[in-house]
Amino acid sequence: YGCMEFGTMEDDYRELRIPKIVRWAASLWLQGAIKDTGYEDVESYWMRKDVKALTEDEKNNYSPLYYIEKNLTKENSPDILIWHGDADLDVPYLQSERLNALLTRIVGTDKVEFKLFHNYKHAADQLYSDENLGILKEYLDEKFA
């Protein structure tokens, strides 16, 4: 649901060619909360730290990818389902692609399923369609029933 690598989101947005003004407009609901905090971007606001000033060690301390790489093995991993929308302006889908790549390298493709939804935004209502909930139910029944 959130960022996987703090300090890389700006690079992701540039790679995806999503300008700041578009991201700003998409996150207007959050801008009021950020405005009076002294943080200049959403990522720093969520972290309550200026992510541009973090050292590599500090970034690792906050990175789920770092903990996954350090602690997860094929033997101790649960089955993992990753869904992300390619129109997400809050968390670039490249974050989930890196998560998927790391997980499949560590635990294998049989334990990780990744689906990128076309034109879905962050926490999009379409994720909760009858069709998608049916897919989710089938996945849970298959893996955990």
Residue locations for each model-derived region?
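Catalytic histidine neighborhood in serine/cysteine hydrolases
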Residues: P78, T104-A123
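Conserved alpha/beta-hydrolase "acid-adjacent" motif
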Residues: N60, L89-R98
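Active-site nucleophile loop of the alpha/beta-hydrolase fold
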Residues: Y1-F6
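Catalytic histidine-centered segment of alpha/beta-hydrolase-like enzymes
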Residues: D90, H118-E131
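Catalytic active-site module of serine/aspartate enzymes centered on a nucleophile-bearing elbow/loop
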Residues: Y128-A145
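Conserved loop-alpha-helix segment in the C-terminal half of the alpha/beta-hydrolase fold
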Residues: D86, S96-D110
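Mobile cap/lid helix-loop segments that gate and shape the active-site cleft of serine hydrolases
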Residues: M9-K70
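Short beta-strand/loop motif that positions the catalytic acidic residue
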Residues: E75-N76, L81-H84, D88
